[in-house]
Amino acid sequence: MAFALPSSLVSVCDKSFIKPSSLTPSTLRFHKLSFIDQSLSNMYIPCAFFYPKVQQRLEDSKNSDELSHIAHLLQTSLSQTLVSYYPYAGKLKDNATVDCNDMGAEFLSVRIKCSMSEILDHPHASLAESIVLPKDLPWANNCEGGNLLVVQVSKFDCGGIAISVCFSHKIGDGCSLLNFLNDWSSVTRDHTTTTLVPSPRFVGDSVFSTKTYGSLTTPQILSDLNECVQKRLIFPTDKLDALRAKVAEESGVKNPTRAEVVSALLFKCATKASSSMLPSKLVHFLNIRTMIKPRLPRNTIGNLSSIFSIEATNMQDMELPTLVRNLRKEVEVAYKKDQVEQNELILEVVESMREGKLPFENMDGYENVYTCSNLCKYPYYTVDFGWGRPERVCLGNGPSKNAFFLKDYKAGQGVEARVMLHKQQMSEFERNEELLEFIA
């Protein structure tokens, strides 16, 4: 599974820092981080969007430097967008505060000496895709004082481009990232006709205040990138429908969701591939914007999450109908809870602090803990900078292990799963016959 792209394919043409187009008011100078924000390491969320053929949108038809023009267009719109997303133009003052000093976001312009299809069609695509992400940044720990947003635009020989973003997890989650991308792309797309002013709502520490739980020091996630690998799996609509029908009949669960059946199958197959199979636990992250009262709008920026989990202590627990039945039960329980006062993620962080370990490390005595982030129904494939929908949206390969990321495949056609496991476990996992039955 070892594979690396030659560094000679990539040449950095320009590196600059993009400041907000207007100064941040002094009243907004310091952005307070919530308890959940503080519990996260200073990592970036890395993602990239591939646009196969970009037609130049030139006011000056004599301009022949396409990369320079595209970069200028994106830089101008990014500068305008950062006025509303001002914390991402600042720096971490400490683990509790962002200094919104308009330092700016880092912006890289890169040429890649191959066609986009060579990357997208590569047998090790999840590794090949990393060529369009800023070097050494995906999932890295961002030191205090570093940029909280890093953007790279990469132009391929075929004329296609990739736009990648490393977005500080300290300030926002996957929903926050999508809000930013949609706003930035809208400003880019409509720059000649309207003056869009994005209106994100930063909640800071107003929902999960550190006054309740106390402040935290920044946790450091230590893992060996060379020992962790990512696998991209596609569950086509027809096979996914067959899996859902099978599980519904055998479990009695009405209309099992795509995320329920796929995460259960991944959990079962990953656990089976582990050298120490049982007991195991599967932890699902929840976006709680619509679960708390009063409901928060989708444009709320922050880490607004909770968790629910299921466990397996014997082989009967690992049967798909049982797993899906338990997932449905636990998510229903989660929706009945007060997700501010009874937030399971906060309870796990507090318990981990008490025991001097990282969250989800040997959780409740379970050595095998898998996490699942469900981004299905998050419209990443609608992010349009003016060149149509992306051909592919990818997540940067990183040092995480025992992690599943689910999202729509090409605007709702099935599910794409990014699975991160230890490389020895992955070699067993990807040969599982039950898994192979339902993937493309």
Curated annotation (Swiss-Prot):
It comes from the Eukaryota. Expressed in fruit 20 days post anthesis. The keyword Chaperone does not apply. Keywords: Acyltransferase, Transferase. InterPro entries: CAT-like_dom_sf (IPR023213). Its EC number is 2.3.2.35. It catalyses: vanillylamine + (6E)-8-methylnon-6-enoyl-CoA = capsaicin + CoA + H(+); (6E)-8-methylnon-6-enoyl-CoA + 4-hydroxy-3-methoxy-benzenemethanol = capsiate + CoA. The active site is at H169, D384. The keyword Glycosyltransferase does not apply. One of its GO terms (biological process) is alkaloid biosynthetic process. Involved in the biosynthesis of capsaicinoids and capsinoids natural products, pungent alkaloids synthesized from phenylpropanoid intermediates in the placental tissue of chili pepper fruit acting as repellant on herbivorous mammals and conferring spiciness to hot peppers. Catalyzes the biosynthesis of capsaicin, a pungent component, and of capsiate, a non-pungent component, from vanillylamine and vanillyl alcohol, respectively. Can transfer an acyl from 8-methylnon-6-enoyl-CoA to vanillylamine forming capsaicin and CoA. PANTHER family: ACYLTRANSFERASE PUN1, F21J9.9. Belongs to the plant acyltransferase family. This is Acyltransferase Pun1. It comes from Capsicum chinense (Scotch bonnet).
